[in-house]
């Protein structure tokens, strides 16, 4: 049987960038474990803040963290109180100077992780899985997605035997490297056990010249 490679990792270095940007020789394992700790801590603290990705950059004794969220107001808090509290907690966790940058997600319905979390939340709230999946897919297509595929696996509707249900709309080219496909896997904890929710969203093609133009404009903006 043909196995599916993770679409995010498959495109790293082609149209996707790394989520951890640092180099280490001897301390690689220590930094990697620290990255995992940081990501888990942020996920735990910002459960309801619709966080899609966390990017980590390192320089000397400084850690720069970019949090991509659909609810920046919730992360920042009144007068920046919440983000300052989070920064202090991360300072203690890592023992380094932490700088946090909040990036707003303009279209949350085009982020696979957020769509998956939405489906999972509905499944936990006892909404019928077909309805939850189809509503999420319709919202994504209305937001401008070229295609979407969703999959739910487990004891659906409390059935004795677990099974897998898939629905798709539009096209999702998994082996075209220039295709901007976002993928995420999320768990839904229901009274009947855990369900796995997978989401693939195709957002169009990223052509090399477009990518280079974006890179050049960023470099010019930084000068």
Curated annotation (Swiss-Prot):
One of its GO terms (biological process) is translation. The keyword Nucleus does not apply. Residues 38-106 form the KH type-2 domain. SMART domains: KH. The keyword RNA-binding applies. Keywords: Ribonucleoprotein, Ribosomal protein, RNA-binding, rRNA-binding. Pfam families: KH_2, Ribosomal_S3_C. Disulfide bonds: none annotated. It comes from the Bacteria. GO terms for cellular component: cytosolic small ribosomal subunit. GO terms for molecular function: mRNA binding; rRNA binding; structural constituent of ribosome. Part of the 30S ribosomal subunit. Forms a tight complex with proteins S10 and S14. Binds the lower part of the 30S subunit head. Binds mRNA in the 70S ribosome, positioning it for translation. HAMAP family: Ribosomal_uS3_B. Belongs to the universal ribosomal protein uS3 family. This is Small ribosomal subunit protein uS3. It comes from Pediococcus pentosaceus (strain ATCC 25745 / CCUG 21536 / LMG 10740 / 183-1w). The gene is rpsC.
């Amino acid at each position: 049987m043909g196995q599916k490679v993770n679409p995010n990792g498959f495109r790293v270095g082609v149209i996707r960038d790394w989520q951890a940007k640092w180099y280490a020789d001897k301390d690689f394992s220590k930094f990697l474990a620290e990255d995992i700790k940081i990501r888990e801590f942020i996920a735990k603290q910002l459960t309801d803040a619709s966080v899609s990705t966390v990017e980590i950059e390192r320089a000397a004794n400084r850690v720069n963290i970019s949090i991509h969220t659909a609810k920046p107001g919730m992360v920042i808090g009144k007068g920046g109180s919440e983000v300052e509290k989070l920064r202090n907690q991360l300072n203690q966790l890592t023992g380094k100077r932490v700088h946090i940058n909040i990036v707003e997600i303009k279209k949350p319905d085009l982020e696979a992780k957020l769509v998956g979390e939405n489906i999972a939340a509905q499944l936990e709230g006892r909404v019928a899985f077909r309805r939850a999946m189809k509503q999420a897919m319709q919202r994504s297509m209305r937001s401008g997605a070229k295609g979407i595929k969703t999959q739910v696996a487990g004891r659906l509707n409390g059935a004795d035997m677990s099974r897998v249900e898939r629905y798709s709309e539009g096209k999702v080219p998994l082996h075209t490297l220039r295709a901007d496909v976002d993928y995420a896997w999320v768990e839904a904890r229901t009274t009947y056990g855990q369900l796995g929710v997978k989401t693939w969203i195709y957002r169009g093609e990223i052509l090399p010249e477009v990518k280079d133009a974006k890179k050049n404009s960023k470099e010019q903006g930084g000068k």
